[in-house]
């Protein structure tokens, strides 16, 4: 049994399952108003009453993020509340909508770690240009960062991971998307993203360079998505960045 502290203010209906406060929406945790985290009193039978507090961290992005998210959550399970949507973040405009929904229900998120790129640069027939040409891509990245900062959260941006050779593959998360890819596109979009992040004082987690260490770029057979080892390597670096930067930012406890 869990007795929720009167310090909490809930923004929507919620369930408490396995000692976890869960909203009835597609996000892992419900909003509370306690210093960028949540607090509850655990009075489980046979245990001493204890108070638990963890900062909330939000992971957003495409299928690359979805590949490492569960490992990041596992690595940080005793340090931070790691949350993420079950849905693919696709392109930057879609991620902007996702982050807005996240703060709508979880205004106390301390840090947002996100990536966008493959979908933005994708040219999928019958379209003849990228979903987000570079300038549009930069515009939506700025809006994502501005929204996070306006809500008091620290932001970490992850670069798009490299491509071994140009080609195409189906998205593996059920979106029915078909992604065309080229490492020349990746380098162009990464440079554009880094320009924005430098302008806005955002930390860049260079997953591109990490994956360049492997001769196959830590890619699975479709040459787009990460191998299991690639997801583990990225998860470890993401967790390190979260540990380092979740204690800073433009908010105070």
Where are these regions (language model features)?
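Short, positively charged and aromatic/hydrophobic N-terminal segments
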Residues: 9, 16, 38-43, 50
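Alpha-helical cap/lid subdomain in secreted, periplasmic
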Residues: 74-78, 94-253
């Amino acid at each position: 049994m869990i007795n929720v502290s009167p310090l909490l203010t809930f923004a929507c209906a919620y369930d408490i399952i396995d000692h976890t406060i869960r909203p009835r929406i597609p996000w892992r945790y419900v909003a509370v108003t306690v210093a960028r985290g949540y607090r509850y009193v655990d009075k489980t039978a046979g245990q001493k009453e204890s108070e638990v507090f963890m900062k909330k961290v939000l992971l957003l992005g495409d299928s690359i993020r979805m590949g490492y998210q569960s490992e990041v959550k596992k690595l940080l399970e005793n340090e931070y509340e790691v949350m993420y949507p079950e849905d693919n973040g696709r392109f930057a405009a879609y991620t902007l909508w996702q982050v807005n929904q996240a703060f709508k229900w979880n205004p106390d998120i301390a840090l947002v770690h996100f990536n966008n790129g493959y979908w933005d640069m994708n040219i999928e027939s019958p379209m003849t240009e990228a979903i987000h040409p570079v300038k549009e891509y930069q515009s939506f990245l700025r809006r994502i960062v501005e929204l996070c900062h306006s809500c008091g959260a620290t932001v970490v941006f992850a670069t798009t991971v490299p491509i071994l050779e140009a080609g195409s593959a189906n998205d593996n998360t059920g979106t029915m998307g078909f992604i065309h890819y080229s490492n020349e596109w990746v380098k162009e979009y990464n440079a554009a993203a880094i320009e924005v992040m430098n302008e806005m004082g955002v930390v860049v987690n260079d997953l591109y360079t990490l994956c360049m260490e492997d001769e196959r770029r830590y890619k699975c057979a479709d040459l787009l998505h990460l191998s299991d080892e690639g997801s583990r390597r990225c998860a470890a670096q993401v967790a390190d960045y979260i540990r380092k930067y979740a204690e800073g930012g433009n908010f105070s406890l």
